[in-house]
Amino acid sequence: AYPDVCRQFRSGFEKMHVCIPMITGGKIGGVIQFLFDKKRFAIDGKDKRIYKAEQYVKESLSVIEAKRLMNTLRESALKDSLTGLYNRRFLQDHTETLIAGVLRREKNVGLIMCDLDFFKQVNDLYGHNVGDTVLKETAEIIKKCIRSSDLIIRFGGEEFLVLMLDINLGETAKIAEKIRSTIEKAKIKVSDGVIKKTISLGICEFPLETESFWQAIKFADIALYRAKENGRNKVVRFSSDMWAEKTYQ
């Protein structure tokens, strides 16, 4: 009934193949395959082993479907519905694993905190639908500026956090500048025409500048606000003198 499920159906090997598709939600979720010696076994449709396997598949499908649904729900809970990016909950749930891997490899994580400049004006002038478009387009631009192995998190509102795993020294600043310049040049198409925006970015590297990952995020955020104070549309790297200022503590 499903000749394309298993390529062994079309093979010329001197073996007997029986493949039982596991169909859940109208889709094939897996295949159980039996391999028999033709000389010692003949299939008549009533073999007990195949029958038991079919019964097992039927009984287990509901459990498999339930687990898949739970995984889907769990994944959706970790993603921002607007941009499709991971959210802060993902960061909270998976930070320990990320940090352990980086420390084991004796590498650094580059952190880039990004915030769209004067984003509130977009919502006020054009409405929230246009604001949503700007956020989605910004997320796509950032994706194109970083490596596929890097992570982007919608940290809140118009703020994005980029985590660059196993980054070489100096590369964080280069990527941050690439993001800044690309967004500055971008023309975001909306229903009423085109919008141009700029972005401010603060950077920090873990564990180079602090042994606490969450403090590294704080440091990147402090650098971001220094970029805002210095006129926006800038990349600022965190320095220890920023943390010493009471304003940020």
Predicted segment positions?
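A short pre-motif secondary-structure segment
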Residues: 151-154, 195
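Catalytic-core segments of nucleotide cyclases and related cyclic-nucleotide turnover enzymes
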Residues: 173, 191, 206-237, 242-249
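A short, aliphatic-rich beta-strand micro-motif
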Residues: 15-23
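Active-site-proximal structural segments of metal-dependent nucleotidyl cyclase/transferase enzymes
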Residues: 94-126, 140-142, 153
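Signal-transducing coupling segments at domain and membrane junctions
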Residues: 1-16, 244
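Active-site-proximal alpha-helical element of nucleotidyl cyclase-like catalytic domains
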Residues: 116, 130-151, 159, 183
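Regulatory loop-to-helix N-cap segments in sensory/regulatory domains
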Residues: 35-55
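Conserved nucleotide-binding and Mg2+-coordinating catalytic segments in signaling enzymes
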Residues: 74-93, 114-128, 136
